[in-house]
Amino acid sequence: MNNTNGELVIRRPNPQDARDVYQLIRDSQTLDLNSAYAYLVLCDYFRETCVIAEGGSQVVGFLSAFRSPLCSDTLFVWQIAVAGSHRKQGIGKRMLTYLLS
């Protein structure tokens, strides 16, 4: 399921997004940067609890989360990143809403 609003698309990630996600997190300069491999694993094996915001063909947002198998009604949000050029537009909130829907 994709959620399009204007040129912004909110969707699940795929393995091809991992490099762009890594660069987005690196460029944020505020979030802990994991290895490129960690983002590949998130975009592939944990894609059901991760979200991409795409503006045009560019990844401008990423949300990663984890649902514990021991407590299925709890969602741990690990990272939320939005490109500096796209902040203050409600993208983080839209990604979280998409994930919870």
Roles of regions detected by a PLM:
Residues 12-78, 83, 96-98:
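Acetyl-CoA-dependent GNAT
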